[in-house]
A protein has these predicted regions:
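Cyclic nucleotide-binding regulatory module and flanking cytosolic helices
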Residues: 2-38
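Phosphate-/nucleic-acid-contacting segments
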Residues: 4, 156-199
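Short beta-strand segments in beta-sandwich/barrel cores
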Residues: 38, 65-70, 112-113
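His/acidic/aromatic-lined binding-pocket segments of jelly-roll/cupin-type domains
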Residues: 39-40, 56-61, 80-81, 184
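Glycine- and acidic-residue-biased ligand/ion/polar-headgroup-sensing regions
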Residues: 45, 56, 60-67, 85-86
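Short phosphate-coordinating micro-motif centered on Lys-Gly-acidic
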Residues: 48-53
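Cyclic-nucleotide recognition modules
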Residues: 79-136
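Short, Lys/Arg-enriched N-terminal segment that forms or immediately precedes the first helix
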Residues: 142-151
């Protein structure tokens, strides 16, 4: 499905597809949703939400990729989540609770995004039932993915982690650099390269 509102621009196509793939919704309601999102461009490596900041909004990825990461006690980057094209991404605990973040939200490539403020997002949840369904789906997917990763990684060595990723999230190894994928797996890039060459 294509949408050409806002002067004929098609910046809302992917967001429209995301919503209509999850719920039945009228064009009128879609346009209400679209009117609350603003187009934003991010540079490669740009930090969108900093450590110890309060998250004020949500991003939908039209092009590019976002990630949530922090630094471990050894000073190494640890990535918790990647937001790929066609999906939502934010520092969710801070977004919900309005507490300080313990991570960074970064564009890892030049990205075209749609941004919605927290107040507008919650307004849509309260006033557009289909958007509430979408939000519930985001929360459920986030919970399931987090549980898979936590329990999937428990007690795994490096090889088992890579095999787990190949089984459950194969796109990560195809779409990301070794450095980024390794930061998600909690192993070194050289270890990841060595394992990939053997599999």
């Amino acid at each position: 499905m294509s949408f050409t509102i806002f002067g004929g621009r098609i910046m809302f196509n992917l967001l429209g597809d995301y919503i209509t793939s999850r719920t039945n919704i009228s064009e009128e309601s879609l346009n209400i949703i679209f009117s609350h999102f603003q187009p934003v461009k991010a540079r490669r490596n740009e930090i969108l939400i900093g450590f110890n900041e309060i998250c004020k909004g949500y991003y939908f990825v039209n092009e590019g990729c976002l990630r949530l990461f922090t630094y471990n006690v050894d000073g190494n980057e640890t990535t918790r989540y990647f937001g790929f094209k066609g999906g939502f991404c934010t520092a969710l605990p801070s977004f919900i609770e309005q507490t300080l973040t313990h991570e960074y939200l970064q564009a890892i490539s030049k990205s075209e995004l749609l941004y919605i403020s927290r107040s507008d997002f919650l307004h849509l949840v309260d006033t557009v039932p289909q958007f509430a369904i979408v939000y519930r789906g985001i929360l459920e997917l986030g919970f399931v993915n987090a549980q898979k990763r936590i329990y999937g990684f428990q007690g795994f060595n490096a090889l088992e982690k890579v095999r787990w990723i190949i089984k459950f999230q194969p796109d990560l190894l195809l779409r990301l650099s070794n450095k980024m994928a390794a930061s998600y797996l909690g192993i070194s890039p050289s270890t990841l390269s060595r394992i990939k060459s053997r599999i």
